[in-house]
Structures are given as structure tokens and as C-alpha cells.
Amino acid sequence: MDSESANSVHPVELCVYSTLSSDLDSIYQAISELRRSQAMLLFTIRKIRDSIKEENDSLYEIQDLEIPIQRLNDLTKRANNLQRKYDLLKEKTSRLAKKEDEE
């Protein structure tokens, strides 16, 4: 009987094995589903990131800003020149007004 009991599986052991194996199968399946879900999320996040990056690049390209910046610099120079001319004219006008007052 010792040899038979040594080779046979005890019913409790069989129940424990059955319970554990079914739990392990469900855990493995859940992990598998989580991995698939994670892969899909990563793929979606990468698509969104790339889309945002493309939109950002198209909105803020340096080449698109070069022309307005150059135009702004030109307008600033013109405004400074006009301010200098205005100051000179104002000074000449005040000198002429003083000369007229003296005469």
C-alpha cells in the first residue's frame, strides 16, 4: 500500500492543484489582456504626441517668423528715423520762434 499511496495523488492535493492552476490561468489571462491594453495605449499616446508635435512645428516654424521679424525691425528703424527728424524739426522751430521774438 505504501507504493500505491506514494504513486497516487491525494484528493486534497488534486483540489489544491486544480484551484491554483485555474487561478493562475485567470491571472495569466488578465496579465495578457493588460499587456495588450498597455500596447494599445502606448500606440495611441505616440500617435497623439506625434500629431501635437507636427502641429506645434507647423505653428512655430522659425522660417515663418523671419519675414514678420524683419518687417518689424524695418518699421522700428523707420520710426526711429522719423523720431529723430521730428526732434530736429522741433528744435529748428523753437530756434526760429526765439529769433522772431528777439526781432
UniProtKB/Swiss-Prot annotation:
It is found in: Endosome. One of its GO terms (biological process) is endosome organization. One of its GO terms (cellular component) is endosome. Component of the biogenesis of lysosome-related organelles complex-1 (BLOC-1), a complex involved in endosomal cargo sorting. Component of the biogenesis of lysosome-related organelles complex-1 (BLOC-1). Belongs to the SNAPIN family. This is Biogenesis of lysosome-related organelles complex 1 subunit SNN1.
